[in-house]
Amino acid sequence: MLTNIAKKIFGSRNDRLLKQYRKSVARINALEEQMQALSDADLQAKTAEFKQRLADGQTLDGILPEAFAVCREASRRVLGMRHFDVQLIGGMVLHDGKIAEMRTGEGKTLVATLAVYLNALAGKGVHVVTVNDYLASRDAGIMEPLYNFLGLTVGVIISDMQPFDRQNAYAADITYGTNNEFGFDYLRDNMVTDQYDKVQRELNFAVVDEVDSILIDEARTPLIISGQADDNIQLYQIMNTVPPHLVRQETEEGEGDYWVDEKAHQVILSETGHEHAEQILTQMGLLAENDSLYSAANISLMHHLMAALRAHSLFHKDQHYVIQDGEIVIVDEFTGRLMSGRRWSEGLHQAVEAKEGVEIKRENQTLASITFQNYFRLYTKLSGMTGTADTEAFEFQSIYNLETVIIPTNRPVQRKDLNDQIFRSAEEKFEAVVKDIEECHKRGQPVLVGTTSIENSELVSRLLQKAGLPHNVLNAKEHEREALIVAQAGKVGAITVATNMAGRGTDIVLGGNLKHQTDAIRADETLSDEEKQAQIAALENGWQAEHDKVMEAGGLHIIGTERHESRRIDNQLRGRSGRQGDPGSSRFYLSFEDPLLRLFALDRAAAILNRLAPERGVAIEHNLLTRQIEGAQRKVEGRNFDMRKQVLEYDDVANEQRKVIYSQRNEILTSKDIGDLMQEIRSDAVSDLVDTYMPPDSMEEQWDIPTLENRLAAEFRLQEDIQSWLKADNAIDGQDIKERLIERIENEYAAKTELVGKQAMADFERNVMLQAIDNQWREHLAAMDYLRQGIHLRSYAQKNPKQEYKREAFTMFQDLWNGIKFHIASLLTSVQIEQNPVAAVEEQPVGNIQSIHSESPDIEELLGQSQTDLVTEAFNPDGTDFSPEALEARGQIVHRNDPCPCGSGLKYKQCHGKLA
């Protein structure tokens, strides 16, 4: 009550922000005539002027009015589009690191140019993030002429791009790409073994298009770079036969072997189910008699069994995945798009492959991972645009510290949002949907039908075919035709059936998208220039009449075939209609068989239905029902927010560890001299080993000197008689022994370094350290996954799972770091340097030299080899010998950065130059 009164008196936070921004809009508008009077050359020169002013100490905020005015005028000249006042507000919101909520059709792509241009002037790079490669390429292509006119370069990151091209794209002032590509490049950059192989610069400023889709819908899906793990493919096939023998329970307390919790998307095996499964696996010979699935030795069997149960019970064909070219391809539940190349983890993908009888590919082991939540928080400044952010404003603020500002529309919204119609059964609902479509089609009103799954879109398509209504289907299976179908969805009488419309990225123009049609004609090589001009002229003349006819028919009509779990997705579907003041309408058709009503609103809604008791085919429209459904959606949104928050809380633990590892790794990559770090690592490793067998402040009787001597010999090749030291000097203690051992190791290491050269040893140290960190980090990630999967069981012991996870993860990380240091010290001190004479090799013609990029030899393999063997195997695979002296005898000098004459493709300093 008091809050509402305060808002009426002082205005809301959003109103106050808009009032401030409008003052800046007035300053920008005051510069418009001045900018229009400039020649093209003078307007272009403004970019260099702004950069100089920034170098002289001015801030981006200080030059904002002028920069925005320049960008608007350049856009008018180059693109033929002038920014509206509300678009200027949107640009300022983005520059301030906030989220701009703008309705569909309000020109978000053009709005971004203002903030992007201003921030690109700082020279630190700007990333424009989109949801797919098509939109990244399209938006970059549209806006590149504007940025080029203003003296800025544009790059595009798309999948399958080579590293060199990626480096060039990131070096540009403005880089377009998808959230996946930006995230994966960050992970790959932290796996390189040469700093010059990195592609990204510092993460400075990002503008995220469809920010709710990327930062919320995909927040629970981590980006993972993985390699194949050793796995038994046959076990998935065997386990696939088990679920049909188990009985599904109707309720959690019912009789049966397992229960499916659809809300939590989990399968729970009952005690009876465990016993039944153990009997089946014992009969198959996978489980020993009287053995238990709970035992540590059988954890893999349990893992495979649960994956098979989830595959059979929770993941359904044409809803969660499709089969394409003999492969399981995941369907994005939020957008309906195919996610080629993505695979479910934890053996689930293999279990689904076994269920569908397609080729089973090996399970992957995580090499590096990060969530979008933690990746995008790495940017110095982050902003975003979307048509629907207000319902998730609290989450944006609490997780990303992003405030949402609702930008007013340029013209008032004319769309009519009609009441939901609710039916008893899905059959009645779809009959009503077809009837509504038929009526719209008769009067020439275009219709967009939104479904939540491929299965439902194909069902609607079959019903429309039966009714003789021509239509287009837009789902994951029709991805290639997507833009064309959406562009023409506003034509007279057009019927378009689509899975979730989130992130489609193409406006539906009433009367059809004229630009798409004219572009298609211009691209048609079978037509002459005269024919193209004639067809384009005819199109332009006929378009206005068609546009007017659609306007008279009521504009685009939206039909939702069920409510999504999130109100935001429903609003995105509605938002396709009524763009830029156009007329339009929307209505949702629901049934009590819909998942949302069945799972979250059934009891109260069913009671209301029984009281109203309509006849078959008669819809219910009641405010109480609508409120009940919205309450169910809010409940689901709250549950999903809690799940995303929980994912973040757990990932924050791994994220802090990731920062430490990546920071240390980067220091090793970029440091010219890592001698001090190596000395510290050797010292720590020896000290830790001595402390293990000679604990500080302990009695001499507690020391285990023989084992210490054995470990020193095995780990560091130190043959020391410590017992004789103790006999010779009664006053000696653990610290004295550490100092003697460290001195001995340092002397031996200095001798090795002198033998091979300081630079060669530094390169070798760097490679060993990076491989050790990567290998141990990979194993640590797997251990963290296992810890995470079972940590919830601690709650049964009255312990807080999150606190337990943090505590154990910290201990594991300490062990990881100590293990890395010990491994590095052990390996490098154990390496033996031998110098054997090497014979000359016959000189190869230049044309036969091949550049090959082979994997480095495994560290474990290096341990048992001499240095000469190592060089022969790693740098001269064919076993031939090579002599730098032989070349010098023929008067040929090989410089350090020249290709090595042995034909390995490596630089001489990285190959046989190490022996020279």
UniProtKB/Swiss-Prot annotation:
- PANTHER family reported for this sequence: CHLOROPLAST PROTEIN-TRANSPORTING ATPASE, SECA INNER MEMBRANE COMPONENT OF SEC PROTEIN SECRETION SYSTEM
Protein's recorded name: Protein translocase subunit SecA
Residues that, per the record, bind Zn(2+)? 900, 902, 911-912
Q: Where does it sit, as one GO cellular component term? A: cell envelope Sec protein transport complex
One Gene Ontology term of the biological-process aspect is: protein import
Q: Which catalytic reaction applies to this protein?
A: ATP + H2O + cellular proteinSide 1 = ADP + phosphate + cellular proteinSide 2
What interactions and quaternary structure are annotated? Monomer and homodimer. Part of the essential Sec protein translocation apparatus which comprises SecA, SecYEG and auxiliary proteins SecDF-YajC and YidC.
The cofactors required by this protein are: Zn(2+)
Give the organism the record lists. Answer: Neisseria gonorrhoeae (strain ATCC 700825 / FA 1090)
Annotated keywords? ATP-binding, Cell inner membrane, Cell membrane, Cytoplasm, Membrane, Metal-binding, Nucleotide-binding, Protein transport, Translocase, Translocation, Transport, Zinc
Q: Does the keyword Cell inner membrane apply?
A: yes
